[in-house]
């Protein structure tokens, strides 16, 4: 297996399709990117036991090779997540014996092993760069493709920054540097979570009371709008960011940034100011919430 005590730390960023060329031309990504075609199948029980537990189980095919991956529910927010992850090569089918030995399946989920079946798929092309930034090594990937859940489809168009060595603070620093020129924004939803929501046709929004919770709710609403194309989620996001900007508990030093976020809302797909403000707020507010 990949390692005995795995931890994946990454920052996920949504990217408008029209701005792909800005990524490819960015001066921090001058080296040619490796391009990989990845076909992924996610598994769960008919009643969604893994999804409810915040577990993602997939087979990833790249050429003639197949990897089996298990990811747990993470902690973080504002696009940043820290999750346990196990990954190892298999012969093309689920390795149930190895699954049974993993912590998530040793107790409550052990009975799910005989009921696992494919529930959704993601197919995308991944372009990958290794970036040295502020003394850290970061893998930056650009994923383009689609999520398929039954007849439903959603577009994958995102950047992921994964810490390979160094300090997690460098992920924020690199994202903020990219956001100076690229209209990206934090994304709160993993591909597996997006697929599960797409399958159900439901995109629940989290309750909010504190400034960090309002930011989280607004970002989740934008993710929901992207996949559902329901404009009510766009209105929900704007309402959440309005509540954040006027919140009495918001640090006064952050209020101008929250207002800048709100002011740039309607031009967020072309103007970098929205994403830069969202990243700055997410970093400073240090959102801590369970992720799926």
Feature locations, PLM:
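Phosphate-end processing signature that detects enzymes handling 5′-triphosphorylated RNA
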Residues: 1-292
